[in-house]
Each structure stands twice: as structure tokens, then as C-alpha cells.
Amino acid sequence: MATIEAIHTATIQVLLADGVGRLTTTRVSERAGVSVGTMYQYYPHKQALLFAIVERQLDLIVRAMLEAAERLEGCDLRTVSDGLATAWLDAKMADLVSSRAIYAIAAEFDLAELMSRAKNLMVEAISPLLRAIPDARFADPDVTAFMLAALLGGTVRVVMEAGSSEDDLERLRQELPRACLGYLKMSACPLCPSDE
């Protein structure tokens, strides 16, 4: 496990220093302090290594969102909105360096399958949560969950890819929950008198 962690850390470092185009398994193995043979034991080529890095990051985000959904079940609309935005930001900002490096990988490789799997898991986590909100109803919680995940992911990506300052990231922490709440309020159907 320590070897894999060293390889992942070295990959991120090489990515950020030199970009995807100059990343090689040899350069990563040198930076990680492992032999090329050891490197190939885990990752037979550059693409396998980069996909593993992306998958690991996506898994962390999905896990954070699943935990948030479990914790927020049955809460009111504002609490759910704020909780999901905060969980997303916490997961993405826990390792800003890795998060930014992932976007470089995404620009170079077709990650549609990995991204689709992550999107489906997010919708599966958020949709039931939206159904359980006592003070809001949604005509199609799956569509609303998809759009909320897109809002979270797209907004954070734009800010991170721009190499934003600490002030920008703090502003994102303040504004993203408001954007999510606004979207959810606009997407909610009026409650029937019997639902209020």
C-alpha cells in the first residue's frame, strides 16, 4: 500500500511540474523511489496509472457525498442544500493539488466511463435524499439530482482550473451553497396544502 501511495503522490507531482504530455512511468518511478519493474507491476502503462489516479479521486468524492446524503436524510431543503455543497467542497479541497491535477488528466484522456459511473453514483445518492426533504417536492428527483451534481462539479472545476486564490476558494465556499439552494428552490414544485 505504501508503494502505491508513493506512486500516486509522485504521479501528481510530475503532472503538476511537467504536465500530462511529459509524464512517463519512468519519471514517476524515479520520483516515487521505486523501480520501473515495480511500477509496471501495478500500472502497465501511463494510461492505467492516470486512470487509477482519477478513479481514486472520484471515489473519494462519491464516498463523501454518500456519507453526506446519509447524514442529511430527512433534513429541510436549506440544510440539505448547504450540506451537499459543503461535502462536495470539503472533498475537492481536502487535496487541492490532486484535484487540480485530475483536471489536467481529464483534458487529455477520454474519461467518459469513469465520469459516467461517478455521476450515476451521485444521482443514486442525491435523488433519494431529495425525495425525503420534508419542505420540498420535486417533479423528477433524478433529473434534479443530476443537475445539482452538474452544478456542484462544474462550478468547482471552473474555479479550480483557473488556479484560483485562497480568496476565490473562500468565496466559492460562501456562494456555492447559495447557488445550490437557489436551484433547488426553483426546481421544487409548490407544496400541496396537505403536504405543508
Where are these regions (language model features)?
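N-terminal intrinsically disordered/low-complexity leader segments
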Residues: M1-A2, Q13, S187-E196
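Basic, helix-initiating cap at the start of DNA-binding domains
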Residues: M1-D18, T26-R27, R31, A48
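Amphipathic alpha-helical segments enriched in hydrophobic/aromatic and basic residues
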Residues: L15, T24-T25, K46, L50-Q57, ...
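Short hydrophobic/aromatic patch on the recognition helix
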Residues: G33-Y43
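Amphipathic alpha-helical packing segments from all-alpha helical-bundle domains
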Residues: R56-L66, T79-T86, D90-A94, F109-P134, ...
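Short linear capping/connector segments at secondary-structure termini
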Residues: E67-E70, A101-F109
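Hydrophobic/aromatic-rich alpha-helical bundle segments in the mid-to-C-terminal region
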Residues: S99-A104, A112, R131-A179, L191-C192
